[in-house]
Amino acid sequence: MLDGLACESYEQALAASAKGAYESADLVSVIVAKNLAYRRALSDRPVLDLPALRTLAALAIAGRPGGRPLSILDFGGGGGSHYTIARTALGASHPLKWAVVETPAMVHAAAPMRDGSLDFFDDMDAARDHLGQIDLVFHSGALHCCPRPRSFLERLVALRAPRLVITRTAFRDGPGTIYSVQKSRLSTNGPGPLPPTVADRAVSYPNVVISRQDVEGVLRTDYVIRVRLDEEAEAFSIGGEPIALGGYICAL
């Protein structure tokens, strides 16, 4: 279990992280390259792994609207891997309107992933306006990457999509917020293997983990929590405190 370097604030964690952090040119370009390769691989051989079931479960919960595409706001969706999973599983006959909300660097780099059903936005309001009626807000593993997780969660809740699914997100059981620098390998970011021309190396970025109590309080302002997801009890640690990954399935 990796131990993150505890910090006093997001700003301190950002300063102690690798240059660029989540918007590092190397990190962003690798994630997009891996997503393009992932799309080609699934087109040639449609085989999904177990983690892909998170995306498929969210789609099943969203249902299928009549007479229009299924409309999904994918918060922190990287290079669009969740869309690729959905498109592979559902096929071209099931129309999708998918908006990924990401960093400006990712939105710019992910231009080759756009295909008429998938688009990228660095502004949540712009993504909402593009989608119109939102059937599902889907969030996988990005809330703890935000400088102010509670504020971003409040904005997601305020969209009032009929279904809200959170998965692979870091929470702490105790009160308050903890900040850290989290380390990983370049190869672990994005789906599939590294491009053969890219050497693996260490990367680091800020993490902000808020309490389950805070998360559930925000969710309950508009939603009923149907299910709590306990996915990984000790995904990593911060200053020796185990941090869990989990999520929620919510309905208006």
Where are these regions (language model features)?
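Class I SAM-dependent methyltransferase Rossmann-like catalytic core
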Residues: A15-R68
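Class I SAM-dependent methyltransferase SAM/SAH-binding core
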Residues: G77-A126
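Conserved beta-strand signature within the Rossmann-like core of class I S-adenosyl-L-methionine
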Residues: R160-S180
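A short SAM/SAH-binding and catalytic strip from SAM-dependent methyltransferases
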Residues: D135-P149
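Conserved class I S-adenosyl-L-methionine
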Residues: R68-G79
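Short alpha-helix
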Residues: R201-D230
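Short, glycine-/aromatic-enriched active-site segment of Class I SAM-dependent methyltransferases
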Residues: G174-Y205
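A short, conserved alpha-helix within the catalytic core of class I
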Residues: C145-L159, I166
